[in-house]
């Protein structure tokens, strides 16, 4: 009778442990899907050009200022000379 009781206790512990890990696996899968979704969203964002890059329009530059066909270093600053 003691062996049966011990066997039932071990079975109960194993089943509860299995259920606990199964539930945690679902949460981690959701967390992974969430992080993948965020990463994909960041990759889809429009990239901007850095300072001294040739441009046609303000929206192409990170500083949002295209002056004399080059992106400026500081937002809103329009220089009259070409960058280095």
Curated annotation (Swiss-Prot):
Main localization of the protein described in the UniProt heading: secreted
Protein name: Conotoxin Am6.1
Pro-peptide positions on chain: 20-47, 78-84
Post-translational modification: Three forms of this peptides have been described. The unmodified Am6.1a (Am3286) is not detected in the venom; Am6.1b (Am3408) is only Trp brominated, while Am6.1c (Am3452) is both Trp brominated and Glu gamma-carboxyglutamated. Both Am6.1b and Am6.1c are detected in the venom.
GO molecular function: ion channel inhibitor activity; toxin activity
Family: Belongs to the conotoxin O2 family.
Modified residues (4-carboxyglutamate): 60, 64
UniProt lineage: Eukaryota, Metazoa, Spiralia, Lophotrochozoa, Mollusca
InterPro entries the record matches: Conotoxin (IPR004214)
Sites bearing 6'-bromotryptophan, chain numbering: 51
Signal peptide: 1-19
Protein species of origin: Conus amadis (Amadis cone)
Positions of disulphide bridges: 48-62, 55-66, 61-71
């Amino acid at each position: 009778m003691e062996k049966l009781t011990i066997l039932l206790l071990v079975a109960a512990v194993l089943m509860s442990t299995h259920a606990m890990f199964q539930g945690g696996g679902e949460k981690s899968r959701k967390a992974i899907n969430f992080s993948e979704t965020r990463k994909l969203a960041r990759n889809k964002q429009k990239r901007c050009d850095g300072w001294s890059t040739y441009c046609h329009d303000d929206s192409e530059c990170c500083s949002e200022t295209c002056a004399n066909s080059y992106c400026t270093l500081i937002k809103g600053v329009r220089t009259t000379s070409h960058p280095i």
